[in-house]
C-alpha cells in the first residue's frame, strides 16, 4: 500500500527545496551583469507553490508541510485536483491560496481529458468543489483550456463554479510542454482570443 511508504518530513522537504534553488542560483554569481542584491534575495525564498508533480494532497503530511511553510513566513499556494477530499477537509493549516483544478464541465469530458485512475474521481472532484467555500484562505478554480478537448458547455462549468463559490476563477490556455506532448499537440493550444471567447 502506497500509504505505508516512508516519506520525507516537511522540514526536510522545505530545506531541500531551498538548497536546490540556491544551487541553481550559484552560477549567476559569476556573471558580472547579474544583480547581486536580487540574487541574495532569491536565496531566501518566501513563496511556495505546492503543485505540478501530481496531486500534493496525496502526501500524508500535507497539513504539516503547509504549517511549516507558514511558520517560516512563506506565502503558500496549493494546487489540487480534488481527489483527496478528506485530506482537504481536514487541513488545519490554511495555505495563502488554495486552487482546485476544474478541467471538464461534466463527467464524460472529465474521464476523457483527465483520465482518472480511480472510479469515483468525478464524485471526489464535486465533493471538493462543495468543500471549497469552507476554507478561510483565498480560493480559486483553475481551468486549463485544451482546444478540441474541454472548451465546450460553459453553462455546465458555470454551475460547478457556482457550487464551489471561489474567490477567483483562473482560465488559462494549455501549453504543449512536458510529458503532455505524448498525447497532445500544439494544435491543442488555444489562442488568447479563443480562451476569452
What are these regions (language model features)?
Residues 14-15, 22-193:
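Conserved AdoMet/S-adenosylmethionine-binding subsite of the radical SAM
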Residues 195-197:
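C-terminal accessory regions of radical SAM enzymes
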Residues 1-12, 16-19:
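Canonical Radical SAM [4Fe-4S] cluster-binding loop centered on the CxxxCxxC motif
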